[in-house]
Amino acid sequence: MKPNVFFGNLFLKFNTEKMNQNLGKLIHLKKLCTENSHFQMLAVDQRPPIFNIIASAKGRKHNYEEVVECKKLITSNLSHLATAILMDPHYSIPNLLQYNNSKGLVITLEEHDFKETLHGRYSSDIDNWSVEKIKKAGGDAVKVLAWYRPDSEKKSLDHQQKYVQRIGEECEKYSIPFLLELLVYPFQDDNNHTKEYIEQKQKNTQHIIDSVKEFAKEKYKVDIFKLESPVDSNDLENVITKETEDAFKNLANATNNKPWVVLSSGMGKTSFYNCLKLAYQNGASGYLAGRTIWLDAFKNYPNIENVDKGLKTESVNYINKLNDLTAQNAHSLKDYFKKGFEIQEPENFTKNFGGFK
């Protein structure tokens, strides 16, 4: 008899070769959660946003040591309040693991300097980096950001879909969760075009929802989504309209019952807090955020002492506020894990448990 494994809200029968991969993914995913199975994850993998902080303050291009210093400040002051931390392999992994006090480790795979055409963007891996290396480095999940909008040029759509599908297949092979971040973006001929990693102004809600629908298909093997707000952050500041509420409902429906967390895109603290409330009402299981938590402290940069003080006070207070909200309102994955670890014929586990292909 083949073993059964729960994944999301779907009860699936896997062959013995696949069972071990999903079991391994579940073990890693559980490490990213609180005891109540919520995600409270801190991002320090940012590259251009950190580069911009340094360039703006010093009037010149960043150097390697300055980027590491900024990331060290964030990691040492805030990681103990997170269930997991998202790190990059250029600056964070080789320098900051000893300062990480969270229990889970998510590692970035994609190159931040993407190729762009008039109506498309093209993602790629960091040079000399791979899913296999992330697994060997002790990662609990592979994070990939895929720029995507359904009305982009066909060549871009095909490339992005094949890119994500390849990574999903590699993550399954190496039994490590695949965390996919999706961001819509402005075309080069749009009035608000930018290559900066900031929230797109006047973004199209349907583009976001349709993008999630595409990558929720089983062929991409996504285990957890990292999603942006389906509406502009300005729409989250004060009175929440029915249109905004409906947008979050439609976003949740697009995930095909896969776990999802919310990203901040550097939006204001009030907007992000309200964004989380709406997301949690619609089944989100936590957050994976960075700039909204720590960026204000870097207004003091290059005064390191004041940056450190800001992180220890304002940033700590805010992440605690997010954690309280998450604990009270986020969708728990307890049943997801409990049912995922239900294995038929446990007495024959070693016999049925397959190896890597």
Question: Across the structure, where does each feature detected by a protein language model lie?
Answer:
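N-terminal amphipathic/basic-hydrophobic helices that include classical n-h-c signal peptides
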Residues: 1-18
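Alpha/beta catalytic barrel-like cores
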Residues: 14, 18-140, 144-152, 221, ...
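Alpha/beta enzyme core
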Residues: 72-76, 124-141, 156, 163, ...
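Short beta-strand segments at enzyme active-site cores
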Residues: 87-88, 142-144, 176-189, 223-228, ...
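Alpha-helix-loop-beta-strand connector modules within alpha/beta enzyme cores
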Residues: 102-110, 160-176, 240-260, 313-327
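Short, small-residue-enriched loops and turns at beta-alpha junctions
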Residues: 150-151, 185-187, 231-238, 267-270, ...
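Amphipathic alpha-helical packing elements
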Residues: 160, 164, 168-172, 176-179, ...
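Glycine-rich anion-binding loop/nest that anchors nucleotide
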Residues: 224-229, 259-268, 288
